[in-house]
Amino acid sequence: MDYVLPYIDTSLDINLINKLGQRTSVPTTYLVPKSETTSTLISGSSDLVAVRITSEPLVSYFCENTESALISTSANLQGQKVASNMAELKAYFNESLSYALPPNKYNSEPSIIIDLVTGKRHR
């Protein structure tokens, strides 16, 4: 959880920040106000950054050993059917796909998306 702090607005209420570290029964992505130093390469033109805390062992391993958040893109392109296999992923991303985790219990379904501040569910 500490690895996301450089990317989010840490002046948020501590209860909201702590909510990011709470385990959920379904994959959950939170939209969180970004820090002033978060690159637009991560947030795009948005004032929010998408944060997903996971217990997926490989991702946890990378974060712990690099002492950093893992920055990734979603396999669920807005307005398109969810990619459910490698062939669909490759069709969506062409040559820009460098690696994808094989489907497992941590990543086989799209996450729900919730605005951390308002509580509004987007998906």
Residues covered by each model-derived region:
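Active-site-adjacent structural elements in enzyme catalytic cores
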Residues: 1-123
